[in-house]
Amino acid sequence: MRYTILTKGDSKSNALKHKMMNYMKDFRMIEDSENPEIVISVGGDGTLLQAFHQYSHMLSKVAFVGVHTGHLGFYADWLPHEVEKLIIEINNSEFQVIEYPLLEIIMRYNDNGYETRYLALNEATMKTENGSTLVVDVNLRGKHFERFRGDGLCVSTPSGSTAYNKALGGALIHPSLEAMQITEIASINNRVFRTVGSPLVLPKHHTCLISPVNHDTIRMTIDHVSIKHKNVNSIQYRVANEKVRFARFRPFPFWKRVHDSFISSDEER
């Protein structure tokens, strides 16, 4: 089994990485950061997001597993005191692969039709660079839906619906559903300006195209990466053809993750 371990970079996570690598030597597992079969994230959910983007070019060949060294994270299956058991499971069993939908974002520019493509595991958030009101036309399935005015828009995946989307009042969507969710960030609604004012859940075969009305620089935050874009003509969102693969060695149902992350106390776990 070829593996690689990515850490948060703090002393606790780095120490746990070295401990795991020593265990793995006993099982003759091969460290291979270029072509791993399994990527182990040690840290928090942010570390797993970084791991996802580092290996997003080979998603069909790699599976991810999270070990959390802080508070319980949403993508975590394992805690530090369980790593020896995890390594035994990796070595001795064929792991189950659970696939989650991803979000595809295509940025198109006014410069000769140039475009860039991104994948998001959690969400893509759009705001203006200078903090002014974002004014965009929202088109669904090729038809104009609304002109949005407000602080921004958040488009999330089902697994990402538990992150920023939840804080914005969006719905929680089970990741077995191939969908994306569009949630408003402080929209302007009065007698003159009007938006739908509710999160929109779109199925896989629907495309959302957003076109800036003004020529403001757009600040796009895709998961943990924030990039400013100039001369944006449109931003296209849809459920990606690719999926992220997680290695499962024991049951950890989605709704239990939600319960453990947002409802139960440490004493109840």
From Swiss-Prot:
<feature type="binding site">
    <location>
        <begin position="45"/>
        <end position="46"/>
    </location>
    <ligand>
        <name>NAD(+)</name>
    </ligand>
</feature>
<feature type="binding site">
    <location>
        <begin position="122"/>
        <end position="123"/>
    </location>
    <ligand>
        <name>NAD(+)</name>
    </ligand>
</feature>
<keyword id="KW-0520">NAD</keyword>
<dbReference type="GO" id="GO:0005737">
    <property type="term" value="C:cytoplasm"/>
</dbReference>
<keyword id="KW-0521">NADP</keyword>
<feature type="active site" description="Proton acceptor">
    <location>
        <position position="45"/>
    </location>
</feature>
<feature type="binding site">
    <location>
        <position position="186"/>
    </location>
    <ligand>
        <name>NAD(+)</name>
    </ligand>
</feature>
<dbReference type="Pfam" id="PF20143">
    <property type="entry name" value="NAD_kinase_C"/>
</dbReference>
<dbReference type="GO" id="GO:0019674">
    <property type="term" value="P:NAD metabolic process"/>
</dbReference>
<dbReference type="GO" id="GO:0006741">
    <property type="term" value="P:NADP biosynthetic process"/>
</dbReference>
<dbReference type="Pfam" id="PF01513">
    <property type="entry name" value="NAD_kinase"/>
</dbReference>
<dbReference type="GO" id="GO:0005524">
    <property type="term" value="F:ATP binding"/>
</dbReference>
<dbReference type="GO" id="GO:0051287">
    <property type="term" value="F:NAD binding"/>
</dbReference>
<keyword id="KW-0808">Transferase</keyword>
<dbReference type="InterPro" id="IPR002504">
    <property type="entry name" value="NADK"/>
</dbReference>
<dbReference type="InterPro" id="IPR016064">
    <property type="entry name" value="NAD/diacylglycerol_kinase_sf"/>
</dbReference>
<comment type="function">
    <text>Involved in the regulation of the intracellular balance of NAD and NADP, and is a key enzyme in the biosynthesis of NADP. Catalyzes specifically the phosphorylation on 2'-hydroxyl of the adenosine moiety of NAD to yield NADP.</text>
</comment>
<comment type="similarity">
    <text>Belongs to the NAD kinase family.</text>
</comment>
<dbReference type="InterPro" id="IPR017437">
    <property type="entry name" value="ATP-NAD_kinase_PpnK-typ_C"/>
</dbReference>
<dbReference type="InterPro" id="IPR017438">
    <property type="entry name" value="ATP-NAD_kinase_N"/>
</dbReference>
<feature type="binding site">
    <location>
        <position position="149"/>
    </location>
    <ligand>
        <name>NAD(+)</name>
    </ligand>
</feature>
<keyword id="KW-0547">Nucleotide-binding</keyword>
<keyword id="KW-0963">Cytoplasm</keyword>
<keyword id="KW-0067">ATP-binding</keyword>
<dbReference type="GO" id="GO:0046872">
    <property type="term" value="F:metal ion binding"/>
</dbReference>
<keyword id="KW-0418">Kinase</keyword>
<protein>
    <recommendedName>
        <fullName>NAD kinase</fullName>
        <ecNumber>2.7.1.23</ecNumber>
    </recommendedName>
</protein>
<feature type="binding site">
    <location>
        <position position="151"/>
    </location>
    <ligand>
        <name>NAD(+)</name>
    </ligand>
</feature>
<dbReference type="GO" id="GO:0003951">
    <property type="term" value="F:NAD+ kinase activity"/>
</dbReference>
